[in-house]
């Protein structure tokens, strides 16, 4: 009876599994049919909630737990098209839900293709920044927790070896271009032949020059039969970029209001203010002091400016928590700052453009742009951190008088018209005296100020739009004074038209222009005298130790060990590269360029132009022949029939192989004997160690080794002798003392040394000490 009940339960379990698999199969078939029958023009109006989409129940369950119920415009238009397997280019406002627009199709496509953990990588999601990659991975983990996929996050700043050991088991991989490219080159287990979907979030940033090398490397490893999804707030129309991605008839998806204007949220209030360069920090300080109950995000153009503003404002204590976030930061610190700012109710974050794209900081009240963005697209992404998902938000852009006209014209083309804001003089407070005091007291703050000054001017110099960014019209001294610096630091910007002209000039003409009438080189007196600073004098100090010039000259190592003392030279070079009287003389001039001099000193470079060497051998008659000379046809026929020569050659080689085989067998036999001898030696040592300990060894405790050879008998243990002599070694006998006293030392009167073994008792030590004192 019990057995029948068990069989009944087992049968019910098997039946339930079959029914479950059958129901899942029927569900997937119905979803495929709904996706194939979907018509965007007809069915788009009927889709308002996630439950109306042709997606699985597990995905709906995860969305419901995360409180995702209604669809946004970009989600309503892009998800059904992506589910049909078509390439997609999605453009929508910032904060409109683009992350779910590509995560849901990724999960559903993998489910329809029956991807398991044993199928390897099936979906790759690329993000331009680490913070955005972390945010995408967190959303994926929440909505896909009821599915059986394995997902991984790979970004810079983490342990590469830890990721390599687990990356082969990932079905969905989220990461930054640099780390994904590194794993494709180095990780053995990262196989991309089964890849189904490639997603580029913030596609225009991923495809620009900053990530060109990494993206090209990633695309070279991926199969062409994949589905590609591109999402961004600002799209790219570059034919070259789209050709790199190998898109096949991509569908362009954009909300109705995004077709002709940029993706600025409607609930965002935009303002701009015209501020001189030397008053920017004063305006920023006054703004923060008047908005202590707000959540503020401040953008600078360089990380050095972020560090300087953070350190100085933190010292001045405005009354609101301050944070900083920029690229050259440890990954742990960046994540901590991101989490703290997301959870804070009132805070101020100084950041660079690293947080301008994709990051979702909840409830940001103000976005302040202290420095002008490089283009309108950067402006759109910056202000998009506020007014997300229909919330209210405000933005403020600080423009210099030289930047106002050009930037407003660029923004007007994209139908962006911020309102002008006037700042009352009584509400503006100057912090220049405090900054000067900080720079005077703390050298670290002063150094940060100098680096921030240089970084700002370099950022303006490298901008492409010269109608907006005019570096020549910037007030240098006034800006340095506003940072609290005693003077403007010297800015060294590499490149420029002067360097290009020097590079294109002929080296010989340049050298001839420096020669006088006699052809001798003259020094350039036009160069201004170099100003020697305190730091130059510190680094130019002569060493007074063994590295001093005097010591090196004494050891003849100051110039590579060569003896080139000027007093001993009787021939000196007066001039070079001058015309000789006799034109028929060979060219024996010194090399006029560094490249020629390097080639002359390099043996490898000298031999490169001489061709390959030839080797000859001489026969008995003294006729030379090439060492690898082929035999002629006539000589071959003289030797006899070809078949006969073949048989003779084979027979000769067989005899040689027999001799070689005998030698190999002998070597193998010697190796076996040596291995056996070592094994016996190990066995003998083990046995001796056990006997020395006095415990002995039972037969069952001995190692199971072969006993082909007779075991060597262990030497009997010698009785301890404390003081021996050369004569005692010849006797070979042991003396026993019944009184327990140590034996009397037997040594020659003229012996200078005392030989003894290790004492074991207190009496032995006393006897040894007495003997040593007597000697």
From Swiss-Prot:
One Pfam family cited in the UniProt record for this chain: CTE_SPB4
Protein name listed in UniProt: ATP-dependent RNA helicase DBP4
Protein family (similarity comment): Belongs to the DEAD box helicase family. DDX10/DBP4 subfamily.
GO MF entries: ATP binding; ATP hydrolysis activity; identical protein binding; RNA binding; RNA helicase activity
SMART domains: DEXDc, DUF4217, HELICc
Gene (UniProt): DBP4
Motif DEAD box: chain residues: 201-204
PROSITE patterns on file: DEAD_ATP_HELICASE, HELICASE_ATP_BIND_1, HELICASE_CTER, Q_MOTIF
